[in-house]
Amino acid sequence: TTKSTIDVNDLTFTTRWTDGDKMGIMYEYDNGEGYNTQATYSNGTFSSKLPEATGTRFYYAYYPYQAADNATSHYVDIPFGAERVQNGNDFNSSYDIMCAEALDFENAEQGKTDDGKDISFIMVRQTALLYFHFTSPEVDEPLTKATLSVEGDPIAADT
């Protein structure tokens, strides 16, 4: 399953879900009791173990999974500092933040829709992927580090 593909001048950058990727699923009952659980990707699908329950509940999905000790609402902190490490096309997916619109069901089994189907999330990327191609005839050694800055405006938050 493709997460994203960028094609610039026939140079393709593709990220894909890989076995072991961890998505967070937060679910909350109508009484405000909330849980944060991990769903792990394997063989083309994410799976998670949710407790047996029926009734009204709300689901929120996000990536990458973050352990949260006290998930009582639909918020989770995802560390996101200003420095990023990228090694060629070896994408660092810990900065590929995605989330899905909340889903709510009135009287469904845990992990199911009201009509008994498995819940399914449409993930939306919260960051941008940028492609840089550096060329210079004066450089006779490999470029190992580059710093991007924008005059007068920050390009990333401190955390």
Model region roles, listed by residue range:
Residues 96-97, 147-159:
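Contiguous ligand/interfacial binding patches
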Residues 1-144:
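Short, low-hydrophobicity acidic/polar segments
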